Amino acid sequence: MTDIPHGRGKVRQRIRELEAEKVELIKRMEVLAQEFQQAFRRPWPAHPVVQRVAGGYVYVRWRLQGRNGKQNYVDLACEAGQVLLSNLELPVRNIYVRYGQQMLNLNVSHAVRHGEWTRLRQYLADCAVLDGYAHAGASHGNDA
């Protein structure tokens, strides 16, 4: 568990570090998806894509070959993913599993950093609100 850095300057510094780490992780996600697409010829039963979702979270996910513009995703650990894997030849299955593990690692790394980044930003915002009350109380005297 990460402790809150002492001092708001250190919190801001940690936020900047987290931002840089998140950018690096997203680059690694994009490289992983590109490597897969360069290593395998179409059509793929599924391929990794980087997806940005609300709230700033970014994931690399398996996109199934869609029809009519639909973009369905699959998790290799769920039932549909297991069916997909079981239909692949063993060497290809092993490659999909290897990519899947790398994707899981990148996704959890990004999610943990994004969660910490979000909480630290909220911490600074909450401190600013409380500072406003502290300064208002000091300038108006103690009315309590």
What are these regions (language model features)?
Residues M1-A144:
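Conserved glycine(s) in the ABC-transporter nucleotide-binding domain "signature"
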